[in-house]
UniProtKB/Swiss-Prot annotation:
<dbReference type="GO" id="GO:0008363">
    <property type="term" value="P:larval chitin-based cuticle development"/>
</dbReference>
<keyword id="KW-0146">Chitin degradation</keyword>
<dbReference type="GO" id="GO:0005615">
    <property type="term" value="C:extracellular space"/>
</dbReference>
<dbReference type="GO" id="GO:0000272">
    <property type="term" value="P:polysaccharide catabolic process"/>
</dbReference>
<feature type="binding site">
    <location>
        <position position="384"/>
    </location>
    <ligand>
        <name>chitin</name>
    </ligand>
</feature>
<feature type="signal peptide">
    <location>
        <begin position="1"/>
        <end position="33"/>
    </location>
</feature>
<feature type="binding site">
    <location>
        <position position="169"/>
    </location>
    <ligand>
        <name>chitin</name>
    </ligand>
</feature>
<dbReference type="GO" id="GO:0004568">
    <property type="term" value="F:chitinase activity"/>
</dbReference>
<feature type="active site" description="Proton donor">
    <location>
        <position position="168"/>
    </location>
</feature>
<dbReference type="GO" id="GO:0042060">
    <property type="term" value="P:wound healing"/>
</dbReference>
<dbReference type="GO" id="GO:0005576">
    <property type="term" value="C:extracellular region"/>
</dbReference>
<dbReference type="Pfam" id="PF00704">
    <property type="entry name" value="Glyco_hydro_18"/>
</dbReference>
<dbReference type="InterPro" id="IPR011583">
    <property type="entry name" value="Chitinase_II/V-like_cat"/>
</dbReference>
<dbReference type="GO" id="GO:0008061">
    <property type="term" value="F:chitin binding"/>
</dbReference>
<dbReference type="GO" id="GO:0018990">
    <property type="term" value="P:ecdysis, chitin-based cuticle"/>
</dbReference>
<keyword id="KW-0378">Hydrolase</keyword>
<keyword id="KW-1015">Disulfide bond</keyword>
Length: 484
């Protein structure tokens, strides 16, 4: 055989080798470029944007946010201009770039360029917005229609992926009985508009039985919402005038104030599990008492405030863990296995005779709740809010996080100490698969659509990684055979 004929015979093989090498390179690049959690569950992270104004180490800017720990982030909050039936920024200097503002909207949505897995929504409402204006809006067909078009345009103008409705709550706090039905109309009309542009539609949902019964037609709103973010916290606080747990996982059978009751009740009312996102608090509720500082002790007035959040009756997890980390502070803590809650209390003040108490979720609480959410086949969990996690990593990590997991002998090693609660969520989500050892069911789509931008486009990310790995292996095996 001549040299020329030999080369011409090898040319197709050479081109095939080059093609396969290019394919292998692309596959490895896909693996390397993956961002976000290494599981297929939803982790929704609310950011309270006023946290930027907190003092010292409590100040939280968008630059502090770690997009790899969340699948969705919700920028909280925008407000309602009822005179225009329009969404509006509540802090133009912080949110917008106009008038030399800081451009918070653009900074948050800009994270998608380097983290393509991330979905960024804008929340409208919140506790301070109240309910009256939203009640007026949804009761009027003209106002409702104007709002639907304007909010769709606003969301797209600032490059958000969707809207989170945080009306607290329909029919409550100067709302009207008709709000329950009118809220369904609002979600339906937003769904129709948002489908034209591929936008997400979610809503924060109250967790108490009273609010659920009076405010929501659960089965109907589930048809139009991609996800229902259940606010499974604030079950108890200083407003009760006695010490209580902020977010107990379970409670006595006749007590509806628990996470388990809220989730089970919503499922009973027809909420699809693949649309339910269970809320986890990155904060505790505080109390002052003249008694001994135990559960159900009578409390005095509003709870004490922290140095960063500076809110009566409220303490961020970062404030709690720093307080408890001080060995000379005189604080003690006690774990309640029935509720997966921690109660911590100070020494008695010699002047006021009061004891300060805080009830909160530790890493162990979070892990147990994630396990519960996975056992119920929920879409995932959400957090309020990432800015009160120990985002700087100032505190020592808990050593009992997986104490209640049967198949975990040691906590996974972490590369970083920051965001201990958020990292626990992602660890526990993956560990729960082995703990429960039950195959995932296929969602029932007979009545509810596949969530937009959620289940359909995040189907088993772990399996995708395995497929990529197998693809790369196959390519290199073929390359090896051709080279022989």
């Amino acid at each position: 055989m001549t040299l020329r004929s030999r080369l011409s015979g090898e040319a197709p093989q050479l081109w095939l080798l080059l093609l396969l090498a290019s394919t292998a390179s692309s596959l490895w690049a896909s693996v390397a470029a993956r961002t976000g959690p290494l599981h297929d569950k939803v982790v929704v992270c609310y950011v309270s944007t006023w946290a930027v104004y907190r003092p010292e180490q409590g100040a939280y800017a968008i630059e502090n946010f770690d997009p790899n720990l969340c699948t969705h982030v919700v920028y909280a909050f925008a407000g309602l201009d009822i005179t225009q039936a329009a969404i509006k920024s509540l802090d133009p200097w912080q949110d917008l770039k106009e008038e030399y503002g800081k451009g918070g909207y653009e900074k948050m949505t800009g994270l998608k360029r380097s983290h393509p897995h991330l979905k960024v929504s804008l929340a409208i409402g919140g506790w301070n917005e109240g309910s009256a204006n939203y009640s007026t809006l949804v009761a009027n067909n003209l106002l409702r229609g104007r709002f639907v078009k304007q909010v769709s345009s606003f969301i797209r103008k600032y490059n958000f992926d969707g809207l989170d409705l945080d009306w607290e709550y329909p029919t409550q706090r100067k709302g009207k009985p008709a709000d329950r039905e009118n809220f369904v109309l609002l979600t339906k009309e937003l769904r129709e508009e948002f489908d034209e542009h591929g936008l997400l539609l979610t809503s924060a949902i109250g967790a108490s039985k009273k609010v659920i019964d009076e405010a929501y037609d659960v089965r109907q709103i589930s048809r139009y919402l991609d996800y229902l973010h259940i606010m499974c916290y604030d079950y108890h606080g200083s407003w009760d005038r006695r010490v209580g747990y902020n977010a107990p996982l379970t409670a006595p059978a006749d007590d509806p104030l628990s996470v388990k009751f809220s989730i089970d009740y919503l499922l009973k009312l027809g909420a699809p599990p693949e649309k339910l996102v269970m809320g986890l608090p990155f904060y505790g509720r505080t109390f002052k008492t003249l008694a001994s500082g135990f559960l159900n002790d009578v409390s005095e007035g509003v709870g004490f405030k922290g140095p960063y959040t500076r809110e009566d009756g409220f303490l961020g997890y970062n404030e709690i863990c720093q307080t408890l980390s001080n060995q000379t502070s005189g604080w003690t803590r006690e774990w309640d296995p029935q509720t997966s809650q921690v109660l911590a209390k100070s020494e008695r003040n010699v002047f006021t005779q009061e004891i300060n108490v805080v009830t909160y979720d530790s890493s162990r609480s979070i892990a147990n709740k994630v396990l519960f959410a996975m056992s119920k086949r929920l879409a995932g969990v959400m957090v309020w809010s990432v800015d009160t996690d120990d985002f700087l990593g100032n505190c020592k990590l808990d050593e009992d996080t997986y104490e209640d997991f049967q198949k975990v002998t040691a906590a996974p090693k972490r590369s970083s100490q920051n965001y201990p609660l958020l990292r626990t969520i992602n660890e526990a989500t993956m560990l729960a698969v082995d703990e429960l050892a039950v195959p995932e069911p296929q969602p029932d789509d007979s009545e509810n659509e596949i969530p937009h931008g959620s289940i359909a486009d995040r189907k088993n990310a772990g399996a995708s990684m395995v497929s990529l790995g197998l693809g790369v292996t196959a390519v290199f095996m073929l390359l090896h055979r051709l080279a022989q």
